[in-house]
Curated annotation (Swiss-Prot):
Function: Transports acetate. Also able to transport glycolate.
GO cellular component, one term: plasma membrane
Keyword Transport: yes
Entry membrane topology: Multi-pass membrane protein
Periplasmic side: 1-32, 99-102, 169-182, 235-260, 326-358, 425-427, 485-493
Subcellular location: Cell inner membrane
Subunit structure: Has been isolated from inner membrane preparations as a homodimer.
UniProt similarity note: Belongs to the sodium:solute symporter (SSF) (TC 2.A.21) family.
Keyword GTP-binding: no
Gene, per the UniProt record: actP
Note: Although ActP belongs to the sodium:solute symporter family, the experiments did not allow to show that acetate transport depends on sodium. The inhibition of acetate transport by the uncoupler CCCP indicates that the driving force used by ActP is a transmembrane electrochemical potential. However, it does not allow to discriminate between hydrogen ion or sodium ion-coupled transporters.
Protein name: Cation/acetate symporter ActP
Amino acid sequence: MKRVLTALAATLPFAANAADAISGAVERQPTNWQAIIMFLIFVVFTLGITYWASKRVRSRSDYYTAGGNITGFQNGLAIAGDYMSAASFLGISALVFTSGYDGLIYSLGFLVGWPIILFLIAERLRNLGRYTFADVASYRLKQGPIRILSACGSLVVVALYLIAQMVGAGKLIELLFGLNYHIAVVLVGVLMMMYVLFGGMLATTWVQIIKAVLLLFGASFMAFMVMKHVGFSFNNLFSEAMAVHPKGVDIMKPGGLVKDPISALSLGLGLMFGTAGLPHILMRFFTVSDAREARKSVFYATGFMGYFYILTFIIGFGAIMLVGANPEYKDAAGHLIGGNNMAAVHLANAVGGNLFLGFISAVAFATILAVVAGLTLAGASAVSHDLYANVFKKGATEREELRVSKITVLILGVIAIILGVLFENQNIAFMVGLAFAIAASCNFPIILLSMYWSKLTTRGAMMGGWLGLITAVVLMILGPTIWVQILGHEKAIFPYEYPALFSITVAFLGIWFFSATDNSAEGARERELFRAQFIRSQTGFGVEQGRAH
């Protein structure tokens, strides 16, 4: 019987070489009632939270940033919930299951961006901005052009990420719950719209917090049971895994995932700087009251995520022992049922039985809902706040801006559902990779240099930002993933899978060159305004504080 060829590697950033890409058909599995019941409990509970949140959303600040009343600890959990996708859980544990130590190296790529956010971005971002990162980028530059560029960068990242999440959700739910793919995509889209439409950032935050707690609990239990099996000895864990894995001792060696040093460097830079340019992550720093709480947010988030990625390493090696060596989880051809991405799900069954399998399946679904809700709110705020209220209709009232935001949520939700259905059998692995590359090549350079480089001008930011965005897209199209695997050409024009090294370089050089050669009076004025911006970014004087409801 033909099983799943893929589950969720496509939602893993730069997952072209991760376990499997999403492509081809998935055969529906028998209906998993335990998983469905647990998921329904989660949905009912979170819809209750959305109703509670809707009664407290009275203003633009409430809708975009939960009134700035989220604590650093709560925001840290929510950031972790926003960032730890189902692909992190299933994809990285699958990488460890197939490649061993390389999976740990890959997971570190998700973490290395957070020290940059902590030391370079979080505090100044909170002190300078209100609702979106474009508030920061345009603080002393021309509002119109910079907000259009920032909004375009945000919307492209959100759209690519959203499509990948929707397709991944449909495939995953079809596999785990036995539901029809189209029903699954519509269900995710409708729930996503309800959370954001009625509850805004407050509901989205609590959905992300609940999801993070459930995911951390589930992963902790699995890791505990694996370590209990080996007498809480890492030496026994690795020895037993090496004894049963087809690659033997080679699973403890690095270097099998990335072909050459250029690809490795480009992948690392994309993951590192892409994280610091994701609009739905940056938006979370405006939900706390001040810069101190923003720093706390990153501290807690990094701790939760670091702990989680250590757990995925243990889970991956546990799957090698308890799943890979067990014929119950193999099909007639000797392959893992459902593909390698199902390693963690099968391990849940192995250590906790059917009930825990249902719990982990429901958590995987909840994980996708939390991520798409954050993405949708980031996309809606880019349209309503950056474009509508600050470019096309300056001076718009809060009521008008919120109305546009909610209309955008509906449009984004409908588009996400339609594209999720259209891309059902397409290889969309490149989409999240491209999203990270664009975030690293367009959003990150502008955010960083607008806060730290006194000589930045609007001309430099515009030219460098657009060059970075276009370079990332063009190189991705000309690279092996799209040019060869999707378009069917014999040889790629651009030889590397990951464009970030080149597109980031183009962006920074473009910003530097066009700013340095800008001798206009407007450019001189923008340079003079840096001192006032610097004082605000350091002291927070004049920043909008959180307030009680």
